[in-house]
C-alpha cells in the first residue's frame, strides 16, 4: 500500500463521557476488557499492511504520545506510530520516553480540517515521497477492519474521495452524518446530523482522499468563513465542486463511542450469543500478560468477560471485568463494566453501571433488550 498516508485524529477531551472521561484522555478510555478506544484504529492500520500512522492531537498531546510510544512502538516489527513534529525525538528514545519535546510553534486547531492544514508537511508525506492518498481515521471508533480492499477500489475508480458508510435504523441517523448515493454508487448528498433524515445510510467516519485534491480544497477553504471541519466543510465542498466521490459499505460491526451510554451499550454487545466482536478480534494492550475469558457460566460468574486475575468473592453477571479488579464478598455486579483495578465493596449490588478505577460508580441508562445468558 505504498503512497497511502494514514492519519489518526485524536483530539477529543471526552466531555460527553461524564465521570468516565474526567481526568483521562478520551482515546485512552478502556474498552472491551482488553484495550483502549484508540487501539482499534491503530490495530486496523497495522492489519492493513500500512507501515505507520500519523497521530494528530493537541489536547494533552505529550501524555497521549508517551502512552502510545510505550504501548505500540517497537512492539510490531515494521510498524510504528509517527508523531509528526515530535517524531525524531521519540525515535531517539526506543523503549523509553524523551526528556523534552520541541516547543509547539503552530496555532491551536479549531477542527479536524485545521489539524490537516497545520501539520500539512507531515500529513502529505509518505516516507521520502509525496503521499498519493490520505486515509483519515478517528480515535474513538470500535471496529475490526482491513482497509486494503477499500484502497484498491478507490484507486481503480480514480475517485477523489471514498467515504465509508453503514446502514442503520433511520431513527438513529440524526446522530451521525447522513449520506445518499445514486445507482452508480456515487455520493449525491451528505448532511451532518440532519433534523429530518431521508436515508438510512450514515458516514462511518473514515475516508480515503486523493492527496492532491484534499490539499487543494483545504487551501480553498482556508481563510473563509468555515467551521474547520472535514465533515461539515471539506466533504460538502468537494460534493458541490462536482468531484467523483464513491462509497464503501462497512458491513461488519462499527461503533462510534460518543457518549457513556453508547459505551455501555457497546460492552453489552460483546456478551451476546453472537457477539459484535470476539475477544480475539480486539487489540490486547491493557495488561496483555493477563488472559481474558468469555465465561458462559460457572461459580460466581455468568455471560461475562472476566480477566484471569480478578479476585471474585461475589456474583458477576453479564459484565466486563478488567484485570486487577476485585468483587467483594456477596457483591453482585450485573450488566456492568468494571475498570482495571477497581474495587466493588462487600455486599454492594450494582446494575447497569461503570465502576471506575477509584471505585466510584457511574450509572448508565438500562437497555430494554436483554443480554443472552
UniProtKB/Swiss-Prot annotation:
- Which UniProt keyword terms apply here? Antibiotic biosynthesis, GTP-binding, Magnesium, Metal-binding, Nucleotide-binding, Nucleotidyltransferase, Transferase
Stated EC number for the protein is 2.7.7.91
Q: Which residues cross the membrane?
A: none
Q: Where does substrate bind?
A: 177, 192-193
The molecular function GO annotations come to:
glucose-1-phosphate adenylyltransferase activity; GTP binding; metal ion binding
Which top EC class is given?
transferase
The answer to keyword rRNA-binding applying to this record is no
The cofactor required is: Mg(2+)
Q: Which GO terms describe its biological process?
A: antibiotic biosynthetic process; glycogen biosynthetic process
Q: State the InterPro entries in the record.
A: ADP-Glc_PPase, NTP_transferase_dom, Nucleotide-diphossugar_trans
Catalytic activity entry: valienol 1-phosphate + GTP + H(+) = GDP-valienol + diphosphate
The family line of this record is:
Belongs to the bacterial/plant glucose-1-phosphate adenylyltransferase family.
> What job does the chain carry out?
Involved in the biosynthesis of the antifungal agent validamycin A. Catalyzes the conversion of valienol 1-phosphate to GDP-valienol and less effectively to ADP-valienol or other NDP derivatives.
PANTHER family in the record: GLUCOSE-1-PHOSPHATE ADENYLYLTRANSFERASE LARGE SUBUNIT 1, CHLOROPLASTIC-RELATED (PTHR43523:SF12), GLUCOSE-1-PHOSPHATE ADENYLYLTRANSFERASE-RELATED (PTHR43523)
Its protein name is Valienol-1-phosphate guanylyltransferase
Q: Which gene encodes it?
A: vldB
